[in-house]
């Protein structure tokens, strides 16, 4: 099982990725984790990436694809892999195809932006314990305070509505086009590609977690 999980920030990809990886016995591959590991290990690509990052630049797609290809040689990838947060852009998707990275499924978790904004902007956190609440779906017994300690809850900057909207804008411009890219490739094929087209699946990411997970596994049959 080799797949890419697509969906907006806050669509619940992280939760479903965990279930998919457990069910199929595959690793979740995050480019951030890969970069940190390569830099720490001092691999040739890691050294190159560190130079760019130390200068405040963005690591090039060539370096990222090189890291991906190295990572896929590891023994834990023999049953497959799940890409989390990658590819983010069309050039990255093209580079993956060109590099012959095989993908069986592209699964989109579709959640309306209004629902994501409500989901994320309603989160409240007790910093010391990490306990999380939601003003609508999982409210504390007393508004604004932690159930166990009575200490104040905060809204993280990442969860503030204007921040969420900005992240959704970036997703719309950069990552959303991947949905069309993969659905077109799945539908029409590409005779020049080194790998077979993936199957493209889209599920609704609204409702309780168990229902969404059931939809995910049904889509991956």
From Swiss-Prot:
NMP as annotated region, ranges: 30-59
Region (LID): 122-159
Residues given in the record as AMP binding sites: 31, 36, 57-59, 85-88, 92, 156, 167
One Pfam family matching this protein: ADK_lid
GO BP field: AMP salvage
Signal peptide: none
Keywords: ATP-binding, Cytoplasm, Kinase, Nucleotide biosynthesis, Nucleotide-binding, Transferase
Subcellular location field: Cytoplasm
GO molecular function: adenylate kinase activity; ATP binding
Enzyme Commission designation: 2.7.4.3
Cellular-component GO terms for this entry: cytoplasm
CDD domains, per database record: ADK
Record InterPro entries: Adenyl_kin_sub, Adenylat/UMP-CMP_kin, Adenylat_kinase_CS, Adenylate_kinase_lid-dom, P-loop_NTPase
Origin: domain of life: Bacteria
Positions with a binding annotation for ATP: 10-15, 123, 132-133, 207
Catalytic activity: AMP + ATP = 2 ADP
Biological or metabolic pathway of the protein: Purine metabolism; AMP biosynthesis via salvage pathway; AMP from ADP: step 1/1
Entry similarity comment: Belongs to the adenylate kinase family.
HAMAP family from the UniProt entry: Adenylate_kinase_Adk (MF_00235)
PANTHER family linked: NUCLEOTIDE KINASE (PTHR23359)
Quaternary structure and interacting proteins, as annotated: Monomer.
Domains: entry comment: Consists of three domains, a large central CORE domain and two small peripheral domains, NMPbind and LID, which undergo movements during catalysis. The LID domain closes over the site of phosphoryl transfer upon ATP binding. Assembling and dissambling the active center during each catalytic cycle provides an effective means to prevent ATP hydrolysis.
Function as written in the Swiss-Prot or TrEMBL entry: Catalyzes the reversible transfer of the terminal phosphate group between ATP and AMP. Plays an important role in cellular energy homeostasis and in adenine nucleotide metabolism.
Protein name in the entry: Adenylate kinase
């Amino acid at each position: 099982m080799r797949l890419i999980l697509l969906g907006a920030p806050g669509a619940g990809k992280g939760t479903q990725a965990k279930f998919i990886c457990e069910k199929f016995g595959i690793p979740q591959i995050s480019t951030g984790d890969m970069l940190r590991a390569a830099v720490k290990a001092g691999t040739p690509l890691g050294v190159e990436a560190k130079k760019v990052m130390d200068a405040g630049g963005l690591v090039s797609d060539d370096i990222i694809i090189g890291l991906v290809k190295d990572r896929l040689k590891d023994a834990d990838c023999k049953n497959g892999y799940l890409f989390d947060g990658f590819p983010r852009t069309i050039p990255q998707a093209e580079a993956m195809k060109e590099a012959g990275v095989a993908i069986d499924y592209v699964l989109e978790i579709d959640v309306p932006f209004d629902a994501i904004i409500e989901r994320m902007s309603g989160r409240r956190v007790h910093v010391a314990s990490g306990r999380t609440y939601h003003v609508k779906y999982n409210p504390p017994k007393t508004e604004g305070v932690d159930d166990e300690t009575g200490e104040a809850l905060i809204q993280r900057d990442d969860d503030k509505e204007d921040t969420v909207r900005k992240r959704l804008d970036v997703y719309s411009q950069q990552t959303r086009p991947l949905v069309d890219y993969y659905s077109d490739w799945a539908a029409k094929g590409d005779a020049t590609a080194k790998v077979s087209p993936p199957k493209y699946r889209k599920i609704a990411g609204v409702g309780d977690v168990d229902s969404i997970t059931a939809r995910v596994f049904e889509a991956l049959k």
